Amino acid sequence: MRDQFISLALMLCILHSACGLYFHISETERKCFIEEVPDETTVIVNYKVELYDPRSNGFMPSSPGIGMHVEVRDSDDKIVLSRVYSSQGRISFTSHTPGEHVICMYSNSTAWFSGAQLRVHLDIQVGEHAIDYANVAQKEKLTELQLRIRQLLDQVEQITKEQNYQRYREERFRHTSESTNSRVLWWSLAQTVVLVCMGFWQMRHLKSFFEAKKLV
């Protein structure tokens, strides 16, 4: 029981983490990120693009003509989302298959501005982190206690999805291991059969050779 409580606490800590970062790209460069997402889980991506200004030697808000093309592919390599957004935006999608989702971003600017340096601030929120609870409380007129219970229920639901996803990964890994072991077994049997046939053929060949030379 104590181990289960510790595991639950660790998973809650993991779920409370968020992916916030920034990276530099040129206007013709493509950057992709992999996010493991359970099925039927909401993912929200917040981003902001800044353009390098050589006069101030810093990054400034990008011009209106520069936007970001965002493409999301699921674990089956199917396109979930693909469209052009402005230089700052909020993207939301829901996963329908569990597994690795690839989020790719690149500038939609033309070659006239190629070579310019961009800084992209990126924040990826998965599951209950993607829910705006302040907005939920205002719409549904929830008290602080009711809102906290709602958050806990969403966290439990997300933990259940994570556990189901881990079972799915374990099942896939077991299937891959069993398939590999089966192929190794059949390959070993095939090698054994080939070696036996080669030995039999060599014995027949040597016997025919000795008989032809009248040594036997």
Swiss-Prot record:
<feature type="signal peptide">
    <location>
        <begin position="1"/>
        <end position="20"/>
    </location>
</feature>
<keyword id="KW-0732">Signal</keyword>
<feature type="topological domain" description="Lumenal">
    <location>
        <begin position="21"/>
        <end position="182"/>
    </location>
</feature>
<comment type="similarity">
    <text>Belongs to the EMP24/GP25L family.</text>
</comment>
<dbReference type="GO" id="GO:0009953">
    <property type="term" value="P:dorsal/ventral pattern formation"/>
</dbReference>
<keyword id="KW-0472">Membrane</keyword>
<dbReference type="InterPro" id="IPR015720">
    <property type="entry name" value="Emp24-like"/>
</dbReference>
<dbReference type="Pfam" id="PF01105">
    <property type="entry name" value="EMP24_GP25L"/>
</dbReference>
<protein>
    <recommendedName>
        <fullName>Transmembrane emp24 domain-containing protein eca</fullName>
    </recommendedName>
</protein>
<dbReference type="GO" id="GO:0005789">
    <property type="term" value="C:endoplasmic reticulum membrane"/>
</dbReference>
<keyword id="KW-1133">Transmembrane helix</keyword>
<keyword id="KW-0175">Coiled coil</keyword>
<feature type="topological domain" description="Cytoplasmic">
    <location>
        <begin position="204"/>
        <end position="216"/>
    </location>
</feature>
<keyword id="KW-0217">Developmental protein</keyword>
<feature type="transmembrane region" description="Helical">
    <location>
        <begin position="183"/>
        <end position="203"/>
    </location>
</feature>
<feature type="short sequence motif" description="Prevents secretion from ER">
    <location>
        <begin position="213"/>
        <end position="216"/>
    </location>
</feature>
<comment type="function">
    <text>Eca and bai are essential, though not redundant, for dorsoventral patterning of the embryo. Specifically required during early embryogenesis for the activity of maternal tkv, while the zygotic tkv is not affected. Involved in Golgi organization.</text>
</comment>
<feature type="coiled-coil region">
    <location>
        <begin position="134"/>
        <end position="164"/>
    </location>
</feature>
<feature type="domain" description="GOLD">
    <location>
        <begin position="30"/>
        <end position="126"/>
    </location>
</feature>
<keyword id="KW-0256">Endoplasmic reticulum</keyword>
<dbReference type="InterPro" id="IPR009038">
    <property type="entry name" value="GOLD_dom"/>
</dbReference>
<keyword id="KW-0812">Transmembrane</keyword>
